[in-house]
């Protein structure tokens, strides 16, 4: 997970998008954690794209066909809040693309105005 966070951090700083680094680090951490929890621990793809000047897209792909599901975590739960945080940080702009070999989860993070 540390390598994924460092990769995203370096790319955003290279693009001069330092204001997005903290939120992006949290997003990539949650997506990678979900990928690991669904059993994909050996092969994972992490990417960052910039589809527009005002948005970055964080991608995490893996070989699991298990789709992520956002759940309502109980107040005393120690897990289950990751996708809800991703949903909040992206204002609902995240999704999953199923592929023959697994899936890619993307999360779109907008530049602050």
Task: Spell out what each predicted region is.
Residues 2-29:
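Conserved short strand/loop->alpha-helix "switch" segment adjacent to the catalytic nucleotide/phosphoryl-transfer site
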Residues 1-2, 12-17, 60-65, 77:
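Short low-complexity stretches enriched in small and charged residues
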